[in-house]
Amino acid sequence: DDRMVILEDTAEIRCAAENAVCLHTSDTIDMARLLKSTMRLRPDRIIVGEVRDGAALTLLKAWNTGHPGGVTTVHSNTAMSALRRLEQLTAEVSQQPMQAVIGEAVDLVISIERAGRGRRVREVINVEGFSGSRYQTEHYAQIDEDIHAA
């Protein structure tokens, strides 16, 4: 059983896994600090409800230190713009471009949009890395199935 550590500002994720730990930010503990503390919990998977600030860099570094298979959400218009959004978030705490770190840590981006009373997968890209001045990606076909919240 993989040990999952779930980090959120607001408790929204429901997880049925037996080996899961849920932690939440507070007025005195922000997401970056929570992520750093998470490393001591020996996680196999790090799940962040939503990354909105420079904590994105801490998350990407954690994923690149033997904690693959993590999940987060980021608001953007397309799958490619999600990668650019991660660049913007990491720029809040680093003057160095972080495209290589993003290209190493992120494997898959799934873009979901609202559709009627539910949501649907708009686009899926596989991220293979960053080289030169662009992300190396493979685009998968659009999936048109509706996803309804339970």
Task: State where each predicted segment sits.
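Conserved P-loop NTPase
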Residues: 103-150
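Switch/coupling sub-region of P-loop NTPases
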Residues: 2-105, 111-115
